[in-house]
Structure formats: C-alpha cells, structure tokens
Amino acid sequence: MHKSVAPAPSILLLGFMASLPGFGVDMALPALADTAASLGASAHGASLAISSYMASFGIAPLVYGPISDRYGRKPIILIGCVVFILASIGCALAPSLPILLGCRVIAGLGAAAMALAMAMARDVYDDSVFRQKLSTIVVAIYVSPIAAPIAGAAVLALAGWRTIYVGLATLGMLLLVGVWLGLHEGSKSRQPGRLRILAMIKDYGRVLSHPACRSYLLASATSFGAVGAYATGSALFFIKAAGMSPNQFSLIFGLTSLASAAGAVLDSRLAAQGIASLYTVAGGLAIVVLGSTILTAMTLAGWTPIAVTVSLFVAMTFSVGGAGPGIMQGSMQQLPELSGTISAAGNCLAMVMGSLSSGLAAIFFDGRTLLSTTVAMLLCSTLALLSFLAAARGTTKPCSVPS
C-alpha cells in the first residue's frame, strides 16, 4: 500500500538525483589527460580529481543520514544541490590543480546528499510498491556509467574540459529546480535532539546491532563488492591481457551496465506481479555465485574465450541488478524511522567494499588471467548470498515474503 500519494514525476526525479553523483565521476573521466596538460599537472595528479570526489562522497552521507532523519530529506538535498553547483563552477574556473581538487572535495560533499534518494522513496512508498519504485532508481544509477562518459567526451571535443564542469553545474541546477518544485517531504520520523553526536552514534548502533538490518547491509555491500571487482579486473584483463582497445572494452562495460539495468527492470515487473524479493534476491545472488565459480574453473583450466566470458559477465551483472532493489528494500523496512541512517550506512559500506574488492583484484592481477577477479567476485557473492539468507531468516518484518 502507499504510505502517501506522491506525484508521478517524483520517482523520475529521484532517479535523476541518485544518478547525479555518478555523472560527477564518469563525465570527468575522458578529460583527465586534458586537465593535467592544462593545469601543468601529472596524470596521477589529475586522477586525484576522481578519488578526492569519491572520498568525500563516501564519507559525508554518514552525517547527512541522521540529520535527514531529524529535519527531513528535502532540506538536506536542496543544500547539497547548491553546494554541488557552486563547487562545480569552482572546478570550471580552477587556475591550478590544488584548487580543482579542493572544489572536487566540496562537490563530493554536495553530491553525497543525493544518497538520500533511497530513503526519500522509502518515506513515500511501502512494500512491493517501494520495491518497484526503487528499481526505477537503480536503473538510473546503472545507466549513468554509460551515458556520462559519452556526454563527457562529447563536451570535451566541442568545448574543452572546463565545460564539463559547467555541464555538471547545469545538471545540478536542473535537479535543484526539480526538487524544489516536484518533490514533497515524506519523512514523518523527526525527533528532537537527533543532531547530537552521541544521538547519531546511537542511531548507527541501533542499525548495526539489529541482526536482520546488519545482514542486509552486509549483503548489499558485498554484492557491490562483486561489481567493483568486475569493473576493475575485467578492464585489466580485456585491455592488458586480451589486447582490446579501451573503446572495445567500453562496449563490453556498456553491455554489462545495460544488463544490470535490465535486471532492475525485471525485478520491478516481478514485484508488480507479487513475486517476493526473497526469491529474486536469493536467485540472483546464486547465479552470481555459480557464474563466478564457472569463470574461476575456466580460468584455472586456461580456457577463457571472449564470447563465453562476456556472456557470463552479462548474466552476473544482470543478476546483481535484479537483486539490488530487494536487498535495499529489506534493509530499510527493518527500522523505517531510521531510513536516512540506514541509507547512509549502506552507501558507506558499499563504497568501502567496492574499493577493497577492486583494489584486491588489481593488486593480485597476474597480467594474464581473470583469476584475481573471479575469486574476488566468488568470495563477495558467496558472502552476499549467505548474508541475505541470514537476514531473511532473522527479519522482523517479512513483508517481502509472500503470504
């Protein structure tokens, strides 16, 4: 049932909101070399424009989540939009690398408020309706890695790297207007005193000490870890070992991103038909475990034909995309009054696990095979499946299980 009636455009705005942080990363990627040359910096120095943004984006939601549980989501999101706009303009005008990096850190702080999109949807929708709407948001998140680099490359070719940040500021302005006019506050769980540091710590303690919620968050983080290992490890394998060009690999990465989006769309359709997320999540994660096991065995046998390997990656990313909305729904339905805190914790844990798994896949890459990638994916997906099953057994609000 609906908790409240939200205007139809709201969920589209939430999808736009959730995808904006990804645009902040992926639109800037094609311009790193030009940025370095323009500012007299090294390639490594220019790449810090990405990592500095991601670091602040990963940490800031830990503060925004509890604040939004106290004051509501919309004010935090509006402030985040303004910060993102101003910082992006600062990036466009930056005369040196240190100023660019400082503005990117601030832009990440603003973009971090967009992580509240999930919590805002949870405030408005409940049960299978929430899962359907959440799938729409997830589709937007998965599509952004395809659209953003293309847009960034086009802008770079037409007007230079600084215009990319003008474009990001423009996206921020569009979102600001959309949120101001089109989104309505749905949080009803505001509590005085929530801003105190000890109260915030207590909220996170409640979330992490709740067995089912903790297991859902671990399942979410480790499933994202499998994706992180794939993203880094597959690039190393296909480009360095298989000899593909970056453009050829981008086609494979785009295909798997579309597969993830298609999985989320299918989950939305299944939710509309009353199919419980218990089945879609468990089935999806089991496919990832099976696929990574097969790829590991193929790698050890020295047989990894490109067509078969890509097909398995497509199947696994499709399955992760289909499982994601159900995992997020499960985590937030345990403590709905702390949806912002749960969303923030999930975002931070996912960033940490994604960075860890992708780092390990890169560190242990042997220059020839997919072994480090497939093992990392197997470990992450197995832990995700076990965590989800533990959460499903221990949940106190099993609304995702059919009656």
Task: Mark where each language-model region is.
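Cytoplasmic helix-loop-helix junction between adjacent transmembrane helices
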Residues: 103-141
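Helix-breaking motifs and short loop linkers at transmembrane-helix boundaries and internal kinks
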Residues: 38-40, 72, 93-99, 243, ...
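A late C-terminal transmembrane helix in Major Facilitator Superfamily
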Residues: 328-366, 377
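Helix-loop-helix hairpin linking two adjacent transmembrane segments in secondary transporters
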Residues: 99, 127, 135-181
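Paired small-residue
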Residues: 83, 87-90, 98-106, 307-313
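Conserved MFS/SLC helix-loop-helix module at the cytosolic interface between two early adjacent transmembrane helices
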Residues: 58-97
